[in-house]
């Protein structure tokens, strides 16, 4: 992978926020489980979304990329799922997408035969014990290899009661919420501890409802799921992504002048929390030309940030905290250690290289604000898209240019990030060792 030399300078202009990766995963899956032909518009073909498209294709959906939309011929009704099941081995390549893996493991258990899940990067280190416990209880066969993703499952999921802790990744609960309505009997998911990442569950329930499936949510303590339901085929537009918008909201908080377009103001996305966090720190938001623009003319102040409901935005809000007055504490963010990299360690290491003062804790960060970042150093993305984009926004506040190693990893979630960064006035060029 390559290196970029990125020069200081504020960003200015308008940016169309890319489609929500979280909603695109859900739309593709619901459409692929549907009873006819769906059309999904405003979709971005990031590496993770391609992984989900190809995974659902391997289960029998026919998915075609058109010029400006995705055409999805669904696997069809529960009866047709049974009729189309063939006892065979199918390989489901999740690439580096944790969402694809955890969403698809129970969905694949709708089918007879052997399912083999493979992937790359840190995906083999993502825990799947929650599913293994269910497999043990239901007699579903499985085998796996330590350290890499090579999981084989054989056996069909049965309806029933599923007890799950609320502090696990919401991806496990989402995977079951997709699958259980298609089983013969009724099911219940019982949450045994307080639910974290409620926003992601809300997104799942919204998508499922949009596609015609009903699930009763009893205050996130239990979910009641009738069996033998059918996903309807619909036309679906994916809304803008607040987890990607977070980078530009944070840039505005740090004195850039960016208008963010194509965001749904009543979105259920958990990462919309970035607005509340930045407003507590001093950001003022205004409407401009049907978009949003922020500024912090009175300065930024510290706050306490709970990472349990919005883990993906923690790297970039840590950057804002590093340049705010006072000491910010980030809590309940231990899950960041098992993302594409250990994001708590990566944020601490790379921002401290730039002159930040961050202390890493087991479940979070202590960030003492500084007045400026120095630059003239080499930082590393850790091959993590969110770390790479955080470093790009950090460069706008540095006194001197920085060199970012392994910048291409943004393709995982935001393939056109560097184009948008350049169009907003960001200045960078390729850099080779020895120059």
Swiss-Prot record:
Gene3D superfamilies reported for this sequence: Enolpyruvate transferase domain
GO cellular component: cytoplasm
GO terms for biological process, alphabetical: amino acid biosynthetic process; aromatic amino acid family biosynthetic process; chorismate biosynthetic process
Uppermost EC category: transferase
Pathway listed: Metabolic intermediate biosynthesis; chorismate biosynthesis; chorismate from D-erythrose 4-phosphate and phosphoenolpyruvate: step 6/7
TM regions (residue ranges): none
Catalysed reactions, semicolon-separated: 3-phosphoshikimate + phosphoenolpyruvate = 5-O-(1-carboxyvinyl)-3-phosphoshikimate + phosphate
Location relative to the cell: Cytoplasm
Keyword Cytoplasm: yes
Binding-site list for 3-phosphoshikimate: 21-22, 26, 169-171, 197, 312, 339
Signal peptide as annotated in the record: none
Official protein name in the record: 3-phosphoshikimate 1-carboxyvinyltransferase
Organism: Clostridium beijerinckii (strain ATCC 51743 / NCIMB 8052) (Clostridium acetobutylicum)
Gene of this entry: aroA
